[in-house]
Amino acid sequence: VHRNGKFYLYYGDANSGGIGVAVSDLPTGPYIDNHDRPVVGMDTPGVLLYDENNRCIKNKKGVPGAISGSENWGMWCFDPCVFVDDDGQAYMYLGGAHPDNSRIIKLKENMTEVDGSAVKPNTPGFFEASFVHKYRGKYYFSYAGHYFGKPANIEYVMSDKPMEGFRNPGVILPNPPVNDGFNNHHSIFQFKGEWYIAYHNRKVAYENNEQDQRSREYMRSVCIDRLFHNEDGTVQTVEVTRDGLEQLKNVDPYRRNEAETMAKGYGIDTEFKARGCSDRIVTSIHNGDYLKIRGVDFKNGG
């Protein structure tokens, strides 16, 4: 998240069981977390729920969670999404392991402290992977709905407010082909007036004929497809493809192109052009090394 002239990288901290933040002057880093506590932790007001006798609600194994049923694995304080609204107010969406474990909380302007208590929105089927986008004044809270036998779809709820009133649950993205029913994570973004969704499957793991179950589960390939909103504000279910989008425009070989603009490379490496500069150059070039650029328009030259 870019704000106050800084870039903020939020992450799940396994050591604290909460969500930390690292800060950098550049989007490419280096990022440093010099805070003495997580931004959101199990002790943050509203993260854990309490009964009428002010006792923390736990599952049958004694793990703090949102309900007392054995199917709840306990609160997962991770997978943060930070959204900055048009008025400058920042919110964090987080949680995991059970539909009752999603949370929303305001952030202060410094982006490293919370403002008030977390609230529990209505997120049927919620499992993990919180994400929020805004379209025509409506807020869309989407998430991985992989919950105990339920298909691992990307689902969503929508509201006129960023912290309450979420309704109309639906499926944005069905579990994609070549994903073997595993979970998913996603981002939704606008580029040149069009909306897209980024997610993952296991295509490369399958093409490499990975036999180990753990390798197939964790070797994930990034995918992008188009996303469309209906006139009533709801989101059309994405038509999931196997090969992704066509290249949006050709590469112009007669202008300066950064080194990471490549379809494939072998042997070479890239590095920053200079300290404090985000531009990259190709380095470590040896005999036999190559890079390939796809979709180049040479026009009448070349």
Where do the PLM segments sit?
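Carbohydrate-active catalytic/glycan-binding domains of CAZyme proteins
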Residues: 1-302
